[in-house]
């Protein structure tokens, strides 16, 4: 973050506004609305500033002279809207020397703080800022948020504030209170408030509080959530909602690290590994951990790359939950195969090239790779091999032994759907050498089939040659140094 967001309590505190123009009036009114006492410093005032003095006679004052050093003494903050560079620079230097927060309108170089665009549903407030880089964009974002937040949210927040101490007295643990408030804001109480029935909303809150007080079952729940192939924009709404609700998150290295920033800030985060052939926790230990945490009353998010039921061991994990009577939800996702194929421009099916598609795994429970058991492989189908990067030579050989010709089109899609995505295409027999030369970062999917020939014309996603790895913990091929990204003429490399 370029700036640390903070809300100041200015009730009864003195603030200085330098300038007597329309901008000074607008900024001064914002301060007055926040409960501040202001002094406008300018030889003359425009009509808007005069209006402020009349409407706020006890809290808005005028000092009819040009700014001089020392006039800012004792101010909680200073806002300069003089419109004169020399004055603005002098104000900034003086305030900086004295440690007084100062903002200069449209001059970010003369600011020690910035004023955001605000959506006001007091006591609920949303602040949006571009850090001074694009104020118009910040205002447009504010306009969009304005349409999403009903004005009744302010009354709902005020009602919650009035009941907060009562709730704290009845529900002693933070987890109980969190569960209660989530049900309030996502249930009948909120709906009643939005419909204008405030009395009914309060009754619904009190009834829910009585039920929660009587509740003795502190058993938690497990959310088995697919994180998708890597791009956070491909998350489902339900996945995002549960990520914000979880008390603890168990995640593997196939879930892009950027996704963890979308998890509730105070949620405990537990890495459980899972990169090629290496596991921070064995699968059995992960299963036991889910049961242990849920039995302790926690809402547990199991965040898995791709879809939990496609080579994600989701079935193994929920078997133990069922055995122990732990409630759970499964949230599907855009699969790694779907995401990689779509972003690489490789259709999985096509009327002219592939009438079927099969998903295979390059990783077996007991280590042995035996793709031949799924033979014969046909040239008019698309094969997607998960976790095949490490053993790509074996994958290539077994697919050829199963019926595919050496020149069958094939591709490796690395870090799919992220800015670091790379696509390597080559005949099946040559793909392992091409991938080794490219030193892919992983994770990667292998796509084999005639539809790969369409990639040059259908590839639409342009990754960044200098992008940082999207999965920095995933590592390189065994025994190889970590690659350094260098600019390339294109994000697709072909043999």
UniProtKB/Swiss-Prot annotation:
List the GO biological process terms.
cobalamin biosynthetic process; methylation; siroheme biosynthetic process
Location of the active site? 252, 274
Q: Does the keyword Transmembrane helix apply?
A: no
Q: What is its EC number?
A: 2.1.1.107, 1.3.1.76, 4.99.1.4
The record's keywords, sorted A to Z, are: Cobalamin biosynthesis, Lyase, Methyltransferase, Multifunctional enzyme, NAD, Oxidoreductase, Phosphoprotein, Porphyrin biosynthesis, S-adenosyl-L-methionine, Transferase
Q: Which domain of life is it from?
A: Bacteria
Q: Which residues carry this modification: Phosphoserine?
A: 130
Catalytic activity, as annotated: uroporphyrinogen III + 2 S-adenosyl-L-methionine = precorrin-2 + 2 S-adenosyl-L-homocysteine + H(+); precorrin-2 + NAD(+) = sirohydrochlorin + NADH + 2 H(+); siroheme + 2 H(+) = sirohydrochlorin + Fe(2+)
Q: List every stretch annotated Precorrin-2 dehydrogenase /sirohydrochlorin ferrochelatase.
A: 1-205
Q: Which Pfam families match?
A: CysG_dimeriser, NAD_binding_7, Sirohm_synth_M, TP_methylase
Q: Where does NAD(+) bind?
A: 22-23, 43-44
Q: Does the entry feature the keyword Disulfide bond, yes or no?
A: no
Q: Which residues does the record give as S-adenosyl-L-methionine binding sites? A: 229, 305-307, 310, 335-336, 387, 416
Q: What segment(s) does the record annotate as region Uroporphyrinogen-III C-methyltransferase? A: 220-495
A GO term for molecular function = uroporphyrin-III C-methyltransferase activity
Please name the pathway.
Cofactor biosynthesis; adenosylcobalamin biosynthesis; precorrin-2 from uroporphyrinogen III: step 1/1; Cofactor biosynthesis; adenosylcobalamin biosynthesis; sirohydrochlorin from precorrin-2: step 1/1; Porphyrin-containing compound metabolism; siroheme biosynthesis; precorrin-2 from uroporphyrinogen III: step 1/1; Porphyrin-containing compound metabolism; siroheme biosynthesis; siroheme from sirohydrochlorin: step 1/1
Residues covered by region (Disordered): 471-495
* NCBIfam families tied to this protein: cobA_cysG_Cterm, cysG_Nterm, PRK06136.1, PRK10637.1
Q: What does this protein do?
A: Then it catalyzes the NAD-dependent ring dehydrogenation of precorrin-2 to yield sirohydrochlorin. Finally, it catalyzes the ferrochelation of sirohydrochlorin to yield siroheme.
Concerning its family, UniProt says: In the N-terminal section; belongs to the precorrin-2 dehydrogenase / sirohydrochlorin ferrochelatase family.
Write the protein's name: Siroheme synthase 2
Protein source organism:
Halorhodospira halophila (strain DSM 244 / SL1) (Ectothiorhodospira halophila (strain DSM 244 / SL1))
Underlying gene: cysG2
């Amino acid at each position: 973050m370029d700036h640390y967001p903070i809300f100041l309590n200015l009730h009864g505190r003195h603030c200085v506004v330098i300038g007597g123009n329309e901008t000074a009036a607008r900024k001064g009114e914002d301060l007055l609305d926040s409960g501040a006492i202001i002094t406008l410093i300018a030889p003359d005032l425009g009509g808007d500033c005069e209006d402020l003095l009349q409407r706020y006679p006890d809290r808005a004052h005028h000092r009819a002279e040009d700014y001089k050093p020392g006039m800012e003494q004792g101010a909680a903050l200073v806002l300069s809207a003089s419109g004169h560079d020399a004055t603005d620079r002098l104000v900034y230097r003086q305030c900086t020397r004295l440690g007084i927060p100062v903002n200069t309108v449209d001059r970010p170089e003369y600011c020690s703080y910035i004023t955001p665009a605000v959506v006001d549903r007091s006591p609920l407030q949303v602040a949006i800022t571009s850090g001074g880089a694009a104020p118009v964009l910040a205002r447009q974002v504010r306009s969009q948020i304005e349409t999403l937040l009903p004005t009744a949210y302010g009354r709902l927040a005020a009602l919650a504030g009035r009941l907060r101490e009562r709730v704290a007295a009845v529900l002693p643990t933070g987890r109980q209170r969190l569960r209660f408030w989530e049900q309030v804001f996502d249930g009948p109480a909120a709906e009643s408030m939005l419909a204008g029935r405030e009395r009914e909303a309060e009754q619904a809150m009190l009834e829910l509080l009585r039920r929660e007080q009587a509740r003795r079952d502190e058993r938690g729940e497990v959310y088995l959530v697919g994180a998708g192939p890597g791009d956070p924009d491909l998350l489902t709404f339900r996945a995002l909602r549960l990520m914000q609700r979880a008390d603890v998150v168990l995640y593997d290295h196939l879930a892009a690290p950027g996704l963890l920033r979308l998890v509730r800030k105070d949620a405990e985060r537990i890495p459980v590994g899972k990169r090629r052939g290496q596991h921070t926790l064995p699968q059995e230990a992960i299963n036991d951990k889910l049961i242990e945490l849920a039995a302790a009353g926690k809402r547990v998010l199991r965040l898995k790359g791709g879809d939990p039921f496609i080579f994600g061991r989701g079935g193994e994990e929920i078997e133990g939950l069922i055995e122990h009577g732990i409630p759970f939800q499964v949230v599907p996702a855009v699969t790694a195969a779907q995401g990689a194929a779509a972003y690489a421009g490789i259709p999985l099916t096509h009327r002219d090239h592939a009438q079927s598609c099969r998903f295979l795994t390059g990783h077996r429970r007991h280590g042995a790779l035996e793709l031949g058991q799924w033979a014969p492989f046909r040239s008019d189908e698309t094969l997607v091999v998960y976790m095949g990067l490490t053993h790509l030579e074996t994958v290539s050989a077994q697919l050829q032994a199963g019926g595919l010709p050496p020149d069958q089109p094939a591709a490796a899609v690395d870090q799919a759907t992220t800015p670091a995505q790379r696509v390597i295409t080559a005949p099946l027999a040559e793909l392992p050498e091409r991938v080794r030369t490219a030193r892919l970062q992983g994770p990667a999917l292998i796509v084999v089939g005639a539809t790969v020939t369409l990639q040059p014309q259908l590839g639409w996603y342009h990754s960044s040659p200098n992008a940082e790895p999207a999965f920095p913990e995933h590592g390189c091929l065994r025994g190889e140094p970590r690659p350094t990204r260098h600019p390339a003429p294109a994000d697709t490399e072909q043999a």
